[in-house]
Amino acid sequence: MDPQGILKAFPKRKKIHADPSSNALAKIPKREAGDARGWLSSLRAHIMPTGIGRARAELFEKQIIQHGGQVCSAQAPGVTHIVVDEGMDYERALRLLRLPQLPPGAQLVKSAWLSLCLQEKKLTDTDGFSLSSPKRSLNEPQPSKSGQDASAPGTQGVLPRTTLSLSPPCTRAVSPPPKAEKPPKTQTQLSSEDEASDGEGPQVSSADLQALISGHYPTPPGEDGGPDPAPEALGKWVCAQPSSQKATNYNLHITEKLEVLAKAYNVQGDKWRALGYAKAINALKSFHKPVSSYQEACSIPGVGRRMAEKVMEILESGHLRKLDHISDSVPVLELFSNIWGAGTKTAQMWYHQGFRSLEDIRGLASLTAQQAIGLKHYDDFLDRMPREEAAEIEQMVRVSAQAFNPGLLCVACGSFRRGKVTCGDVDVLITHPDGRSHQGIFSPLLDSLRQQGFLTDDLVSQEENGQQQKYLGVCRLPGAGQRHRRLDIIVVPYSEFACALLYFTGSAHFNRSMRALAKTKGMSLSEHALSAAVVRNSQGVKVGAGQVLPTPTEKDVFKLLGLPYREPAERDW
């Protein structure tokens, strides 16, 4: 294994932020092309990294400077905006800033405001984004929106003269630096010579690499090793809570009946009704006590009036009449949709063609190659394998891969990595710490596994996903009585390894929560990367990719999102 490859995976970032205890402006690298527009020239901002994350705060600072603005400390004369995390409140912000009150003319605004400004390339209204003191008296003058002078209509994007005259204006954030012989490097381009510039290079051991793979990090001295509590500001975000602290379901007698209906709607293709039931079921499972009245049911977010009526019917009669009227098609549709490669629409088509059993499908239906394989191994695919069998499958792939290159990393993800006792399938992620040697391994590895008789059927022989390559197939361990199992092999570049590891570990519910949280912060999370300053249109559709943030480990992803780190076993939602 190339040790330099490992070192590059844990870069030492150069900080570009102001000392919060100083009135001096931040020292910012040489401006990049694009300042000329200067549409942020009237902005003098301090970015408070708490909750936002240091890397994202640095990115905001860089964007402000690039577009003509200035970055100040919170105490600097003339500061106009102090930008804080979405979950921050006014009083806590002042405590962290060590200020008795906001500086004259300054506004406390949420980071979403700055993200919106960067997306629209103009200073936008701060209405709905600004934080004010709950103790503010009614006769105290209110700051004008987005720093505009209310007496001067038509001056959108220009800060009021009165605000700027309260104190001496800030000096320019940077003075023109001497000409460099080479263009300045961006944060993601810092090389090993930059890392060693302070005389101390990062020391990354094999234990660090093992921690990255397993997701288990050593507990610092003095800590009890239990899961960190979720920050209060993150509320009920699933990704902020350890799954080990799932609430007791006090309404099991209700949710188990609603789940039957939800499943019926799902196999019938009524996805919106199925989604509505799923939300109500999750809300009832999380409720802190048994539901006892119609009013109480209606008060639970996610449970509407009609759902509350069904809850009361179950409470009063112990039954739900709607279950008596589930179509006879539902069990047949469920049977068909469990064939790998057949979704709800295909299952419905087969039902309407008059098929009622797997024998009908086997003898009469027109099947794709994938559906034929799914039907052939129907019972094996539905049977969950013991954890020990999944470990043997991972080992088989690892030994074969490392026969080509001993430095390759192979990690089983999914329910196996989350510590489940049984697994439905196995996802094996493959990479190499040097960032290069994973290339060219995909096809030779699959050929080797086929020659050994380990891979028995190919479902999708190669699926390209950016720089990632994915194989979906069927395997069987050597020996009598072994069953056919679903296996996915994904080869990824090391720069995407942490985000891919997070994505393929799951759970799906946990991943959806993390992606949704990232979206609220103007970011985007995928199996490839975590990006900041993402541009979305009014429908929330991403139209600008933003800037990829460095994420050498899963821990970095959590940190950049302002989340406490959750080990894989704590993500089993």
Swiss-Prot record:
Q: Could you mention a single GO BP entry for this protein?
A: DNA replication
Where, per UniProt, does this protein localize? Nucleus
SMART domains membership? POLXc
Please give the subunit comment from the record.
Interacts with PCNA. Interacts with PAXX; promoting POLL recruitment to double-strand breaks (DSBs) and stimulation of the end-filling activity of POLL. Interacts with XRCC4; promoting POLL recruitment to double-strand breaks (DSBs) and stimulation of the end-filling activity of POLL. Interacts with NHEJ1/XLF; promoting POLL recruitment to double-strand breaks (DSBs) and stimulation of the end-filling activity of POLL.
InterPro entries noted in UniProt? BRCT_dom, BRCT_dom_sf, DNA-dir_DNA_pol_X, DNA_pol-X_BS, DNA_pol_b-like_N, DNA_pol_B_palm_palm, DNA_pol_lambd_fingers_domain, DNA_pol_lamdba_lyase_dom_sf
Annotated Mn(2+) binding sites: 425, 427, 488
Cofactor(s) of this protein: Mn(2+)
One term under GO cellular component: site of double-strand break
Q: What is this protein called?
A: DNA polymerase lambda
Taxonomically, the superkingdom here is Eukaryota
Tell me where the signal peptide lies.
none
Transmembrane stretches in the record are: none
**Swiss-Prot/TrEMBL keywords:** DNA damage, DNA repair, DNA replication, DNA synthesis, DNA-binding, DNA-directed DNA polymerase, Lyase, Manganese, Metal-binding, Nucleotidyltransferase, Nucleus, Transferase
Q: Which reaction does it catalyse?
A: DNA(n) + a 2'-deoxyribonucleoside 5'-triphosphate = DNA(n+1) + diphosphate
Q: Write out the ranges of the annotated region (DNA-binding).
A: 263-277, 343-346, 464-503
Protein species of origin: Rattus norvegicus (Rat)
Q: Residue limits of the BRCT domain?
A: 35-131
Instruction: From the UniProt entry, list the residue stretches annotated as the region Involved in primer binding.
Output: 418-427
An example Pfam family from this entry, by short name, is DNA_pol_B_palm
Q: Which GO terms describe its molecular function?
A: 5'-deoxyribose-5-phosphate lyase activity; DNA binding; DNA-directed DNA polymerase activity; metal ion binding
Q: Where is the composition biased (Polar residues)?
A: 127-149
Function in brief: DNA polymerase that functions in several pathways of DNA repair. Involved in base excision repair (BER) responsible for repair of lesions that give rise to abasic (AP) sites in DNA. Also contributes to DNA double-strand break repair by non-homologous end joining and homologous recombination. Has both template-dependent and template-independent (terminal transferase) DNA polymerase activities. Also has a 5'-deoxyribose-5-phosphate lyase (dRP lyase) activity.
Q: What is the lineage of its organism?
A: Eukaryota, Metazoa, Chordata, Craniata, Vertebrata
Family affiliation: Belongs to the DNA polymerase type-X family.
Residues that, per the record, bind dCTP: 384, 415-418, 424-427, 511
